[in-house]
A protein has these predicted regions:
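Conserved alpha/beta-domain cores
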Residues: 1-301
């Protein structure tokens, strides 16, 4: 099976570099750059131009995924301030902000549909912080009404991973944000350096949540766009549990492609099973390394 290797980017100017480094498309385009550090929301035309630029960088038919505005109390916007929250990581962020400020999401979806029309390309559009099927339905119907053909969600909340067969019903694809998924699964704040041991995506519980998402996804393409995708050894584990697209910082693409090229799907499944059987992140990594091609040790050192 072909595994797509894509890039995470935060600005249209990052797209050509990502392509040069071997990205087959974009697995996560963070649209926040258009919204942060300004007093007013960006216009539809301004957004359309940025989205069209990214779509045109890659070949026709390439997977280019736009994440709708992922802001909130932890990434406050001057023009969409919902007030201070004691625990912003669990507050009105991502899709929850969009449901309060429908004007922002509707303008963004209109701009993405216009960019698709202008370029003749079909963007993948996904919403962050979706926790229930009702939220997935809300976003899907709004996006499709705006003219978006390929609609998805981020899987960052354990409830979505555990109930993927239901939550993913209204959408066409999903992308797992392993950074937030780890934070929520392990009840450990990503910003607390002292909790680094809990926050590694090698946690067997996190790998199990990724597997649960893939197991319930039916024929939908499941990708990973968290830091986990850029680790050549962990990439093999992710493919082994059912992930079919990996998106990472452009600088990590070569090493991940090298690791993938040395393993077939059956080998990846065996590596994943060994990691899942482990009781700790260290054990999971050691077990995976033992079964991987020896060349991978050089790639991850």
């Amino acid at each position: 099976e072909r595994i797509l290797v894509l890039a995470n980017i935060g600005n249209p100017s990052d797209a050509p570099t990502a392509k040069k480094k071997g990205a087959e498309g974009v697995g996560l385009f963070r649209t926040e750059f258009l919204f942060l550090d300004r007093q007013d929301a960006p216009t539809i035309d301004e957004q359309t131009e940025a989205y069209a630029t990214v779509l045109k960088t890659f070949d026709e038919g390439a997977k280019v995924v736009f994440r709708t505005l992922d802001a909130g109390a932890d990434k406050p916007l001057a023009f969409a301030n919902l007030g201070a929250e004691e625990n912003p990581a669990l507050g009105r962020r991502g899709l929850r902000l969009s449901q309060v400020r429908t004007d922002l999401i509707d303008a963004q979806l209109e701009a993405l549909a216009k960019a698709a029309e202008q370029t003749g390309r079909d963007p993948y559009v996904m919403a962050p912080m979706v926790a229930t099927k009702a939220e997935a339905e809300w976003f899907s119907s709004r996006a499709r009404a705006a003219g978006i053909k390929t609609v998805g969600i981020m899987v960052e909340v354990p409830s979505t991973a555990l109930r993927s067969s239901q939550v993913l019903e209204p959408v066409d694809f999903a992308s797992i944000g392993t950074n937030d998924l780890t934070q929520y699964a392990m009840a450990a704040d990503r910003l607390q350096g002292e909790l680094a041991e809990l926050l590694t995506p090698w946690q067997p519980a996190v790998i199990q949540l990724v597997k649960a998402t893939c197991d319930g996804a039916g024929d939908r393409l499941i990708g990973v766009c968290g830091e986990a995708a850029g680790d050549p050894l962990l990439a093999l584990v992710l493919v082994g549990v059912g992930v079919r697209s990996l998106s990472m910082a452009a600088g990590k693409i070569t090493a991940v492609k090298a690791a993938l090229s040395r393993h077939n799907l059956e080998q990846c499944r065996r590596i994943a099973d060994a990691a899942l059987a482990a009781c700790s992140p260290e054990e999971a990594r050691t077990a995976a390394l033992k079964l991987a091609d020896p060349s991978v040790e050089v790639l991850v050192s």
